[in-house]
């Protein structure tokens, strides 16, 4: 974060962007496109229930079509009385990649408009549940033309296997902020302008713990 980094948290409903430079948060943005729309694309394209589309995305999804094994197959449950059918993982990736590319392109637009694009020497850090999908790093580097990596919270105590992963980054950041607030002897919610301050400290924690 001293050299410059963009934190991109791809959640279910939104993609949150925070840009750091010189050890401080410089710009934030919220993009209303994220993992849920990827799931919706799969459900519509494959004509399968949303719940099954989510399972297919998590278990078999690839963000970059060229990386998916064309021989590997995934079972797609049908709607209503329709029988399930088989689909190649590469064809599935063909549904997913355009939406991920759109998300990354919007993030790139945010970075450019922020005026900090040239100072992101440390590149892009991806967090959130969707960031673990195979191919996200490779597609991100194609679009951003910068180093891209997943952010994993540093946690070595009990349940580390559960929480030391990108999808847990937001929860871990909020818990850490609550702990620090208690140590400081005040409640974050009672402080004037605390939401903006808490957001900044939360993002600072996330980047500092990868």
Where do the model's predicted regions map?
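Helical "lid/coupling" subdomains associated with nucleotide-phosphate turnover
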Residues: 1-7, 16-210
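Short, glycine/acidic-enriched loop or turn micro-motifs at the edges of active sites
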Residues: 12
